[in-house]
Regions:
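Aromatic- and Gly/Pro-enriched helix-to-coil junctions and flexible linker segments
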Residues: 1-89
Length: 89
C-alpha cells in the first residue's frame, strides 16, 4: 500500500515544527503545499517536499527539526517512500 500524506507523513510533524516552519512560509501540514509539483533551481520537480526532506536528512542546513530530536531512519525512509510513491494524499 502506498505511503500517504494524511496517514503516514503529516502525523510525523510536531505542532512546534509546523508552527516554526509556517513563519518561513513552509506549510508542513498542507498537502497542497507539500505535494506541489513545481520545481526550482535545486530540484526539477516537487521542490517543496524535496527541500523539506533534504533538511530532515541534513543534506540542507539548518537541519530539521530545529531544537528537536532528528527523525529516525525509519521515519526518513517513510518520507522518501512517499515521494517515490508519487506524493499520495
Amino acid at each position: 500500500m502506498p505511503v500517504s500524506f494524511a496517514t503516514d507523513i503529516e502525523p510525523l510533524f510536531r505542532p512546534t515544527d509546523i508552527a516554526c516552519m509556517h513563519r518561513f512560509g513552509v506549510e508542513l501540514n498542507d498537502y497542497g503545499y507539500m505535494s506541489d509539483a513545481t520545481g526550482d533551481d535545486t530540484f526539477p520537480d516537487h521542490a517543496n517536499a524535496r527541500h523539506v526532506y533534504a533538511r530532515l536528512t541534513g543534506d540542507e542546513l539548518p537541519r530539521m527539526p530545529m531544537g528537536g530530536t532528528f527523525w529516525s531512519d525509519e521515519q526518513l525512509a517513510c518520507f522518501n517512500q512517499w515521494m517515490t510513491d508519487g506524493f499520495q494524499a
